[in-house]
Amino acid sequence: AFEPYYYEEFGAFYSPYSYKDGDTIRSIQLGRKDYDYHYMDWYQIPKLLDSPYWSEPYFDEGGGDMIMTTYSYPIYDQLGHMVAIFTAVLSLEWFAEQVNSIKPYPNSYNIMIGRGGTFLVHKTKENILTETIFATARQTNDEEFIATAHKMVKGESGMGEFERQNQRFCFFYAPIKSTGWSVAVACLHSDIFSSVNNVRKYSYL
């Protein structure tokens, strides 16, 4: 996505965009008057920060027409002037599938939160982009879980425990430093320690 009139012949909104459609790579011209990308976060923020930037997930109406996150990388000319933003987009649905494919135990589930605590990945799809980990933590009335939620947003890593629907979970979390997000896996306490209990049981025989 180029700065206005960098190429005079292409006008103010030159932004060639390629995407995969099945087994075919298609290309379109994304920029236009009713889709002025120069004022969108994925363009403005890396330009202002003068550095690469991962956007918070958003619905890109008129562009990708899906919920996605964008990695933006500023491009400069020989004089050091920024002339364009190179982007790569990830479908949030696809990204969630990759995260959810990691299951240490049959009853495990994963979550991922954005910089402000909004769920980006959650086992309940209705919670994605509409609910925060803070709201969920308050519903449990579990002080340890509430403290863990704040630690995740601060970019810390660690382990916590919480109880939900009369089941005790262990909660392992770590930051994704390049994005400012945090990912966690929740595992049933009984699943984790069942193998330990089995070893103890056989050691007594």
State the predicted function of each range.
Residues 1-66, 119-141:
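Extracellular/periplasmic ligand-sensing ectodomains of membrane signal-transduction proteins
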Residues 64-103, 121, 170-174, 180-195:
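Conserved beta-strands of PAS-like sensory domains
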Residues 203-205:
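Selective recognition of signaling/oligomerization transmembrane alpha-helices
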Residues 76-77, 115-116, 135-201:
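Extracellular/periplasmic juxtamembrane segments that couple receptor/chemosensory ectodomains to their
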Residues 38-39, 95, 144-145:
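Amphipathic coiled-coil/heptad-repeat helices and related helical stalk/stem segments
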Residues 45, 97-102, 148-151:
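Amphipathic alpha-helical regulatory segments at dimerization interfaces
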